[in-house]
């Protein structure tokens, strides 16, 4: 945690700012040629994540190109599975794979009885390296996946659009699902504590698949576990950002102990700010596809996004989803410059 007044943190806490801070989800990623080169040098995605020097390097790459207002730890929400010895691997054009997914009581019982956060020491070393490079010039956002979102991958075994196994467990064996979520929550608490101890300035919780749940299930199987993590890791001066692709269920979030909500591009920033009675800062929410258009369209998108939040503070400019590999780096440069210029208070 930094003692410096960083623009991002000030806006999240809704203090006086001179312009809107901007950063980009997946800002270190496949749209940057230097990232591809470093990933190839490492020998693959997971080898890159587990190499503290190279993970630091790719974290810094977008900051060398663009005047962004935060660094984002280069990692993945599924590395927490290293605490369970679940052998996470990635394959190009497929994504994450667990060869032995958790689908039965027997599968769960085969995992270690004690979780070992030291299996994530490579993340701690990456954070230390990044903090050294930043030298307090910018804040560093650390992150985790929500227990529900992580569980969807551990149960399905890969990235899927059907979610048949986790939905089946939700209906037929909710007790087993709860035990899996308890395990992930326990590991996530230790992991977040380590990130904060090693210097991250904010924690973001990606509840990417929270929208699969509705009503009481959303509260019971997602928000309940997120709140347990927040309550167990609260650190003064380290704000918590919650992100979901959900287009509904927002009423369930009102009692969550967070500081900022990241929303997708389908929602109106100002309406969301008022819906939550200005309790939370709002992050977002330019449609990523606009970055495929000409500069005049990008500028109009920036103006429209800023105009939907007509308040002096409490907005963090971002995309509605993570940036995609087909975006040209020059378009990002133009976007960031426009946000900085057009958001001056």
Which role does the model predict for each range below?
Residues 1-92, 96, 327-345:
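N-terminal basic, low-complexity leaders that serve as flexible interaction/assembly modules and, when applicable
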Residues 2-18, 50, 115, 119, ...:
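Metal- and O2-centered redox machinery and metal/ROS homeostasis
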Residues 35, 87-101, 154-166:
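Short, flexible, mixed-charge acidic loops at enzyme active sites
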Residues 37-49, 105-116, 254:
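Short, basic, glycine/proline-bearing loop/turn elements
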Residues 93-132:
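A gly/proline- and charged-residue-enriched helix-loop-helix capping module
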Residues 119-345:
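Active-site loop segments of alpha/beta catalytic cores
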């Amino acid at each position: 945690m930094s003692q410096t007044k960083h623009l991002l943190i000030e806006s999240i806490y809704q203090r006086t700012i001179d312009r809107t801070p901007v950063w980009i989800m997946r800002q270190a990623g496949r749209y940057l040629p230097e990232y591809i080169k470093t990933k190839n040098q490492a020998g693959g995605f997971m080898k890159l994540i587990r190499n503290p020097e190279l993970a630091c390097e790719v974290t810094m790459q977008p900051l060398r190109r663009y005047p962004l207002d935060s660094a984002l730890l280069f990692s993945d929400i599924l590395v927490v599975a290293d605490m369970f010895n679940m052998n996470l691997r990635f394959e190009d054009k497929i994504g994450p794979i667990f060869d032995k997914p958790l689908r039965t009581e027997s599968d769960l019982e085969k995992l270690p009885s004690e979780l070992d956060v030291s299996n994530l020491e490579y993340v701690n070393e990456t954070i230390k390296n990044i903090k050294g490079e930043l030298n307090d010039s910018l804040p560093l956002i650390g992150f985790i996946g929500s227990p529900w979102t992580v569980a969807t991958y551990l149960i399905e075994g890969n990235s899927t659009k059907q979610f048949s196994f986790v939905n089946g467990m939700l209906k037929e064996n909710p007790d087993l699902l709860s035990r899996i979520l308890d395990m992930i929550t326990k590991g996530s608490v230790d992991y977040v504590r380590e990130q904060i101890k090693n210097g991250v300035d904010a924690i973001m919780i990606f509840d990417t698949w929270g929208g699969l749940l509705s009503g009481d299930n959303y509260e019971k199987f997602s928000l309940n576990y997120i709140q347990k993590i927040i309550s167990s890791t609260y650190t003064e001066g380290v704000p918590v950002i919650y992100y979901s692709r959900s287009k509904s269920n927002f009423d369930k979030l009102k009692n969550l102990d967070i500081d900022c909500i990241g929303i997708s591009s389908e929602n109106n920033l100002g309406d969301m700010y008022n819906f939550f009675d200005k309790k939370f800062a709002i992050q977002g929410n330019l449609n990523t596809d606009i970055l495929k258009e000409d500069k005049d369209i990008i500028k109009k998108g920036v103006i429209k996004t800023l105009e939907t939040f007509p308040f002096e503070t409490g907005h963090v400019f971002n995309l509605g989803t993570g940036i995609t590999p087909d975006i040209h780096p020059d378009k990002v440069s133009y976007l960031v410059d426009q946000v900085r210029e057009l958001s001056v208070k």
